[in-house]
């Protein structure tokens, strides 16, 4: 087992914003491997996010973004539990990043639940016809369609999209990381995207 130094703990803490004891435990669990410790903390953070998911989010703010060309604008409702967190710089930055994401990618809904069922059925029919036209066997067409629908959700659902500033993360990860850091449930209420001439 590698010796865990105060410098290692400090460095991990600066990278993750996790508590000092959590960083020390993560390094101990991962035998001093910083990359694995970051993953360990993220997994712990995700479980924190899951525990907080049932809490009411009645505070928050409206984040906005106007593209530099002045032709695209976005408003996004970001909700949290307390006004203290709503005024936090990291929360405000998250709202700004979400608004920029929406401006760039034009999602249809926050998550899968917000996508119109008729739209999904139309997409399913298109993918099914395409697979059959390509001569795919009937028994694997449904698997192909399911895979195509999952890919479609990643394109049209905000929480499933790759983050425009770091495509190794999806927006859900960004949200969960902020929940873990701030210690409160955070949800995206709704959003509105305007585009001149659209």
Swiss-Prot record:
Write out the GO cellular component annotations: cytoplasm
Principal location class: cytoplasm
Role description: Associates with the EF-Tu.GDP complex and induces the exchange of GDP to GTP. It remains bound to the aminoacyl-tRNA.EF-Tu.GTP complex up to the GTP hydrolysis stage on the ribosome.
Key words, A-Z: Cytoplasm, Elongation factor, Protein biosynthesis
Q: Name one GO molecular function term.
A: translation elongation factor activity
Q: Where is this region: Involved in Mg(2+) ion dislocation from EF-Tu?
A: 82-85
Q: What is this protein called?
A: Elongation factor Ts
Family, similarity comment:
Belongs to the EF-Ts family.
Q: Which organism is it from?
A: Oleidesulfovibrio alaskensis (strain ATCC BAA-1058 / DSM 17464 / G20)
Q: Where in the cell is it found?
A: Cytoplasm
Question: Quick check: keyword Protein biosynthesis in the entry?
Answer: yes
């Amino acid at each position: 087992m590698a010796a865990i130094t105060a410098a290692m703990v400090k460095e991990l803490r600066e990278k993750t914003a996790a508590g000092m004891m959590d960083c020390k435990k993560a390094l101990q669990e991962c035998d001093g491997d910083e990359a694995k410790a970051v993953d360990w903390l993220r997994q712990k953070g995700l479980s924190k996010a899951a525990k907080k998911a049932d809490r009411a989010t009645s505070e928050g703010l409206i984040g906005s973004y106007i593209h530099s060309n002045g032709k695209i604008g976005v408003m996004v409702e970001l909700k949290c539990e307390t006004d203290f967190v709503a005024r936090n710089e990291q929360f405000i930055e998250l709202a700004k990043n979400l608004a920029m994401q929406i401006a760039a990618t034009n999602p249809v809904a926050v998550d899968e639940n917000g996508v119109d069922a008729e739209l999904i059925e139309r997409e399913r029919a298109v993918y099914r016809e395409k697979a059959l036209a390509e001569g795919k066997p009937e028994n694997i067409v449904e698997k192909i369609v399911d895979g195509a629908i999952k890919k479609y959700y990643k394109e049209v659902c905000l929480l499933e999209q790759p983050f425009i500033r770091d495509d190794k993360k999806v927006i859900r990860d960004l949200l969960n990381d902020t929940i873990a850091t701030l210690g409160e449930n955070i949800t995206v209420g709704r959003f509105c995207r305007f585009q001149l001439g659209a």
